[in-house]
């Protein structure tokens, strides 16, 4: 009897401690100082944080090299997004501030701090490039060029619907709309729900916090960036070289590089049919930001010859 009781207790304890974070728990984060293992558990040993064992909140380099402020300075940030406070932009009055970006990034320890300095710079350039495309206010003949107008908009343009899909897990709140907001233009109740749970904010009842609270706005975008969505890897794992394409990925021409990140975000509409102006816009931002950070953009920037992963978080919004 004692043996059976002990076994049952151990199983209950195991179930209670499993699936605390990461893709197994809707992108939920561990407490500060803990890593999320590839199995979705939180801890701070090599089994959780070591190479090949960690899926998110992984340790960066030691000392100053692991500090995001050492990768991108305030002046670089302003140079990249130098028209975000233009009078024509919703983000004027410095909504998308450097301090808000750094503060939000602090909740995701691996973001911009994983790998060597080249990997860290490329991640910041890629993140700001993809989100700049989603929020751009630029046009071909815009002052300083079309790639100087990222982070202009806070909310989806036009007349968006409520983006409410019936769900018992992520029920829509009365009168709330879940259209695109923030740097990554997160949309749909089934994305606001898990994002809010991961960052500790009730976004189902308060979706507009993504467009009114600067730190929450950046957190929503970094959450998307860091969260794998099977069969897709996370954008973070791609740009830092942690993702290794499977046989199916290779057969679909999905190889490591900036192009796969575009495929993750909006491959269903933009990838697999040759040249696409939206893809080229993303690449244009990326090349400019890599130049400012003093790093090469790497290979495989396009996704024109890649088959898409299928629908993603943003496929219906862009």
UniProtKB/Swiss-Prot annotation:
UniProt-listed CDD domains: chitinase_GH19 (cd00325), ChtBD1_GH19_hevein (cd06921)
Location within or outside the cell: Vacuole
InterPro entries assigned: Chitin-bd_1 (IPR001002), Chitin-binding_1_CS (IPR018371), Endochitinase-like_sf (IPR036861), Glyco_hydro_19 (IPR016283), Glyco_hydro_19_cat (IPR000726), Lysozyme-like_dom_sf (IPR023346)
Cellular component annotations (GO), alphabetically ordered: vacuole
Enzyme class label: hydrolase
A single GO BP: defense response
A Pfam cross-reference name: Glyco_hydro_19
Cleaved propeptide residues: 312-318
Classification via SMART domains: ChtBD1
Induction or repression: In response to infection, elicitor, ethylene, wounding.
Active-site residue list: 134 (proton donor)
Domain called Chitin-binding type-1: residue spans: 19-60
Keyword Signal: yes
S-S bridge residues: 21-36, 30-42, 35-49, 54-58, 89-152, 164-172, 271-303
Keyword set, alphabetical order: Carbohydrate metabolism, Chitin degradation, Chitin-binding, Disulfide bond, Glycosidase, Hydrolase, Plant defense, Polysaccharide degradation, Signal, Vacuole
Catalyses which reaction(s): Random endo-hydrolysis of N-acetyl-beta-D-glucosaminide (1->4)-beta-linkages in chitin and chitodextrins
Known EC number: 3.2.1.14
Family: Belongs to the glycosyl hydrolase 19 family. Chitinase class I subfamily.
Role: Defense against chitin-containing fungal pathogens.
Name recorded for this polypeptide: Endochitinase 3
Organism per entry: Solanum tuberosum
Originating gene: CHTB3
